[in-house]
Curated annotation (Swiss-Prot):
PROSITE patterns: RECA_2, RECA_3. It comes from Pyrobaculum arsenaticum (strain DSM 13514 / JCM 11321 / PZ6). The gene is radA. GO terms for molecular function: ATP binding; ATP hydrolysis activity; ATP-dependent DNA damage sensor activity; damaged DNA binding. Gene3D superfamilies: 5' to 3' exonuclease, C-terminal subdomain, P-loop containing nucleotide triphosphate hydrolases. GO terms for biological process: DNA recombination; DNA repair. It comes from the Archaea. CDD domains: archRadA. The keyword Nucleotide-binding applies. Pfam families: HHH_5, Rad51. Involved in DNA repair and in homologous recombination. Binds and assemble on single-stranded DNA to form a nucleoprotein filament. Hydrolyzes ATP in a ssDNA-dependent manner and promotes DNA strand exchange between homologous DNA molecules. This is DNA repair and recombination protein RadA. The keyword DNA damage applies. NCBIfam families: PRK04301.1, recomb_radA. InterPro entries: AAA+_ATPase, DNA_recomb/repair_Rad51_C, DNA_recomb/repair_RadA, DNA_recomb/repair_RecA-like, DNA_repair_Rad51/TF_NusA_a-hlx, P-loop_NTPase, RecA_ATP-bd, RecA_monomer-monomer_interface.
């Protein structure tokens, strides 16, 4: 057997061994992580090999106090899970076929999205006040609970509310309309009110343990930008705000990818005073949110209870828009 063939076989065996390692293996099983370090990591939300593999060196270094050691631990976790190995585009395609989707409850919007809101992705919903962003979030928190044959995932939701707009009464209306027990529907939603940007980010860290312990398939942050805009006003604070927002969005994306959950964030709009033709509004958050979100939807009001939603940024969807109505039962075609 040639040395090249031996090397190829060895690499294949290494990849196969990595695949067979459970990503939920306790973090203390990692090389270089004992009980003391393991306890420190768990206190900050790093419970498993997978948690560490998706972390940054800076994050772990702040916990264990040594950057070089943090790098070694992360490299060990990634090697254990085979994250250093290249795979074929065909394998990527096969993996994407396993992506789960949550129906929005609006057939035309599901078709526009290719089946609904994807797991392992961050979907951003942009719009003015009263455009229906929160209504859509409420409906998704109900829809995710439905069985798969009805467009759901038979799962629970986490709802982080930054503007005090969550209404359990609305959840109950939507649940009844879809044949769910209203009290049980509420019981399947883990709710938290975020009172500052720091609190909001801490809640996302805590969400990780809830996702691990419960059957959670949806995380909603409504709205992602509100506290950041109010706490960092003016150009002099813009760089600090964007740096902090960048970490927050990165944490959400890692959470979505690591635990196969759908993340939906809502975003506000801001006016461009120098625009005289076309739409003078643009999403808040700048390039951080533009690059951080996987899919971007724009909601706007039409006449009476009709709303129009447009997909304006996606890795593979064509641009398009559909309309829906907001009724007592929820969002419908």
């Amino acid at each position: 057997m040639s040395s090249k063939k031996k090397k190829t076989d060895a690499e294949a065996a290494q990849v196969q061994a990595a695949v067979e390692v459970s990503p939920d293996l306790d973090v203390e099983e990692l090389e270089g992580v004992g009980k003391v370090t393991g306890a420190k990591l768990k206190e900050k939300g790093f419970y498993t090999v997978k948690d560490v593999a998706f972390a940054s060196v800076k994050e772990l270094a702040e916990i264990i106090g040594n950057e070089e050691r943090a790098l070694q631990i992360i490299e060990s976790a990634r090697k254990m899970l085979g994250l250093h190995s290249f795979i074929s585009a065909l394998e990527v395609y096969e993996r994407r076929k396993k992506i789960r989707r949550i129906s929005t409850g609006v057939r035309s919007l599901d078709e526009l999205l290719g089946g609904g809101i994807e797991t392992r992705a961050v979907t951003e919903v942009v719009g003015e006040f009263g455009s229906g962003k929160t209504q859509l979030c409420h409906q998704l928190a109900v829809m995710v609970q439905l069985p798969e044959e009805r467009g759901g995932l038979g799962a629970k939701a986490i709802y982080i509310d930054t503007e005090n707009t969550f209404r359990p009464e609305r959840i109950m209306q939507m649940a009844r309309a879809r044949g769910l027990d209203p009290d049980q529907a509420l019981n399947n939603i883990f709710y938290a009110r975020a009172y500052s940007s720091d609190h909001q980010m801490i809640l996302v860290e805590h969400a990780k343990s809830i996702v691990k312990q419960h059957n959670v398939a949806l995380i909603v942050v409504d709205s992602v930008i509100a506290h950041f805009r109010s706490e960092f006003p003016g150009r002099e604070n813009l760089a600090e705000r964007q740096q902090k927002l960048n970490k927050h969005v990165a944490d959400l994306l890692r959470l979505a990818d690591a635990y196969d959950v759908a993340v939906v964030i809502t975003n506000q709009v801001m006016a461009q005073p120098d625009v005289f033709f076309g739409n003078p509004l643009r999403p808040a958050g700048g390039n951080i949110l533009a690059h951080g979100a996987t899919y971007r939807l724009w909601l706007r009001k039409s006449k009476e209870n009709i709303r129009i939603v447009k997909i304006f940024d996606s890795p593979y969807h064509p641009e398009g828009e559909v309309s829906f109505r907001i009724t007592e039962e929820g969002l419908i075609d």
